[in-house]
Amino acid sequence: GKVTGQPLYRLLGGKVRDKVLCYSHVLGKTNEEKAALAASYVKERGLKVIRLRAGAPAANGTLGGGVQDGPKVEPWTPEEEIYNTVEFFIRVREQVGREVGIIYDLHERFSPAQAIRIIRQLEPYDPFFIEDPVAPDCIASLRSVREKTSVPIAFGELYKSRHECLPAITGRLVDYIRCDVIRIGGITEARKIAVLAETYDVKTAWHGPNDVSPITHAVNWHLNVS
C-alpha cells in the first residue's frame, strides 16, 4: 500500500461499504460493576454492540473478576457457574435494553452439555452471538451445540490457517468466523478465509482484543470494508 500510495482496501478489490459495526468489551472488577457500566458504554460511546464475560471463580483466584493478590474465593461448582452466567446476562440485558447487541464469550469454560444449557436459557434474551462455546478442535461438540441451540455462534480465534477453519465453515457450524489475522498468517490468509466463509454464508468477525497493535485493528477494518 505504501509503495503504490493506495489504501489496503483498494488493493483488495475496492471498498464495498463505508462503515463497519464495532463493539467494545465492557471491563469491570465485579459482575455488578460490569452490568452497571454496560449502559454507560452504550450511552457515552454510541455503541450498538457490546461484549462481556462474567467473572468466574477459578483455581488461582477469580477469572475476569478479581486480582492476583486478592482474597481467595470459595470452591465453586459448574451448576453455580451456569446460574452465574445466565443471571449476569439477564442483568446486562435489563440495563441496556433490547436495541443493543450483546456478545457473550463462554471462553471454552463448559462442557458441550453445559454450553447447550446456558445458550438455551439465553435464547429469550437475544444474544448477538455466543463466542467459543467449545474448544476449537472439538468439531463434534460444536456440531452438537449448533444442532441443539438457535443463537448465532462465533468461533475460530485460535485457528492458525484456513485449513483449520474448513470444518466449521463448510459444515455451516458457525455464523461468524472469528480468526486472529496475526495468528492465521496475515492479510493474504485472512482474505482467503473471508472468501471461503462468504461461500457458505458465514460472516467474518476478526479477533481484535486490546492487546493487539493499532496496525492490526487497521488491517481488520480494511478487510471488513473491502
Listing of model-derived features with the role each one plays in the protein:
Residues 19-148:
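Metal-dependent enolase-superfamily TIM-barrel catalytic cores that perform enediolate-based chemistry
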Residues 7, 21, 101, 152, ...:
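Proline-centered loop/turn at the N-terminus of a beta-strand
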Residues 1-3:
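Metal- or metallocofactor-binding catalytic centers and their adjacent structured scaffolds
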Residues 12-17:
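Flexible hinge/switch segments at interdomain interfaces of large molecular machines
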Residues 7-8, 49, 175, 204:
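Residue-level detector of short coil/turn "hinge" positions at structural boundaries
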